[in-house]
């Protein structure tokens, strides 16, 4: 017997997430990890079947091949959700076409002091200053190896690599390379994260020479020729983005992920952060969700225009609906990622977005999603 899984309990999950979002999230990941460990038991199979029934939707018109990988749908899970890869084998059962693990650093690190994750419901946003808390590349590699032994990857898995807090900026390249060496066999693509606002000095690596060295060193050890992308900030100037595009071409990067969270606070409805009593202007961290939707789309359009559509873009930032997704695709994104939207809209939002994308294809008389990529520039 099948039923729409989680619908009766989702309001309870939301209440828990509101009271302590980080704790609720950790409990969810631990539960999903336990489910993965028991995927071959009777109850494990039953739950996974119900997840598939409730949350997945596939249509051949949405399937794409990029970098030698098959993406059944264009909607993936953004980094920041599953930092240690605990649920890496489960995300396909929620309808995601791919999932990005991390951010992962070479050295395990606890992240910043708590509280460090806040929901801003008035803005349909989140503020996080987690600080890349994760178990470190070696442990994450072990977790992923065990996961793939139970069940081979069903969707492409990416790993978002970040610099360890204890590593000096001038040694950043070796930090990324060290993580990559541990993890290169356990994922399908890799992301150089130089845009998180929560690791001191990290965003300065986007500017020129140091990113140059990181990309050079990574590609020099990339013997399996894994696709490597770079994830950029929405707060960069157009000139800085042009420089990153140039580096992407020089080092034959697979694409650009646009964008990470913003440190800007303009236009927010939230004035005071309830949990701390402080003004939102004074609170450190990156904002994700609806407030960055427009800016991330502008960055996507700029990259697509500058590269004439020759460099694949993964669009992320403020995707809640099929309309949001369509806007990013027609602006130039081949693939999409979301996390904050998934939390606010519930786990049904992935299949809702994919169904909505198919309706858009039918409306515009297009036979495949790839025809919609950058469509705004062709009309």
From Swiss-Prot:
The active site is at residue 196. It is found in: Cell membrane. GO terms for biological process: 'de novo' pyrimidine nucleobase biosynthetic process; 'de novo' UMP biosynthetic process. Its cofactor is FMN. GO terms for cellular component: cytoplasm; plasma membrane. GO terms for molecular function: dihydroorotate dehydrogenase (quinone) activity. Binds 1 FMN per subunit. Signal peptide: none annotated. Pathway: Pyrimidine metabolism; UMP biosynthesis via de novo pathway; orotate from (S)-dihydroorotate (quinone route): step 1/1. It comes from the Bacteria. Keywords: Cell membrane, Flavoprotein, FMN, Membrane, Oxidoreductase, Pyrimidine biosynthesis. Substrate binds at residues 83, 128-131, 193, 198, 260-261. InterPro entries: Aldolase_TIM, DHO_dehydrogenase, Dihydroorotate_DH_2, Dihydroorotate_DH_cat, Dihydroorotate_DH_CS. It catalyses: (S)-dihydroorotate + a quinone = orotate + a quinol. It is a peripheral membrane protein. FMN binds at residues 79-83, 103, 160, 193, 231, 259, 289, 318, 339-340. Its main location: membrane. It is an enzyme of class 1 (oxidoreductase). Its EC number is 1.3.5.2. Monomer. Belongs to the dihydroorotate dehydrogenase family. Type 2 subfamily. Catalyzes the conversion of dihydroorotate to orotate with quinone as electron acceptor. This is Dihydroorotate dehydrogenase (quinone). The lineage of its organism: Bacteria, Bacillati, Cyanobacteriota, Cyanophyceae, Oscillatoriophycideae. The gene is pyrD.
């Amino acid at each position: 017997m099948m039923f729409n899984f989680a619908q009766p309990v989702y309001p309870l999950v939301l209440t828990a997430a509101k009271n302590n979002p980080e704790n609720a999230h950790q409990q969810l990941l631990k539960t999903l990890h336990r489910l993965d460990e028991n995927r071959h038991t009777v109850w494990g199979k039953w739950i996974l079947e119900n997840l598939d029934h409730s949350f997945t939707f596939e249509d051949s018109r949405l399937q794409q091949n990029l970098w030698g990988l098959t993406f059944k749908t264009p909607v993936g899970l953004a980094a920041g959700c599953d930092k240690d890869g605990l649920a890496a084998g489960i995300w396909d059962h929620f309808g995601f076409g791919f999932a990005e693990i991390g951010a992962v650093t070479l050295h395990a690190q606890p992240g910043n002091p708590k509280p460090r994750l806040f929901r801003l419901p008035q803005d349909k946003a989140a503020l996080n200053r987690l600080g890349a808390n994760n178990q470190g590349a070696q442990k994450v590699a072990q977790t992923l190896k065990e996961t793939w032994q139970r069940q081979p990857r069903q969707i492409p898995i990416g790993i978002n690599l970040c610099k360890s807090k204890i590593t000096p900026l001038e040694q950043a390249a070796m930090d990324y390379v060290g993580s990559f060496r541990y993890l290169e066999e356990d994922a399908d693509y890799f992301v150089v994260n130089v845009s998180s606002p929560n690791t001191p000095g990290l965003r300065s690596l986007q500017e020129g020479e140091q990113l140059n060295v990181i990309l050079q060193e990574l590609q020099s050890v990339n013997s399996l020729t894994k696709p490597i992308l770079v994830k950029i900030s929405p707060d960069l100037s157009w000139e800085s983005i042009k420089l990153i595009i140039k580096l992407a071409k020089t080092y034959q990067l697979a694409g650009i992920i646009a964008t990470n969270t913003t440190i800007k606070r303009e236009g927010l409805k939230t004035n005071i952060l309830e949990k701390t009593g402080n003004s939102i202007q004074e609170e450190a961290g990156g904002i994700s969700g609806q407030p960055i939707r427009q800016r991330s789309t502008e960055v996507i359009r700029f990259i697509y225009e500058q590269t004439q559509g020759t460099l694949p873009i993964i669009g992320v930032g403020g995707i809640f609906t099929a309309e949001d997704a369509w806007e990013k695709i027609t602006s130039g994104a081949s693939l999409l990622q979301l996390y904050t939207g998934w939390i606010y809209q519930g786990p049904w939002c992935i299949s809702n977005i994919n169904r909505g994308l198919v309706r858009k294809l039918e409306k515009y008389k297009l036979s495949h999603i790839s025809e919609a990529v950058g469509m705004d520039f062709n009309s």
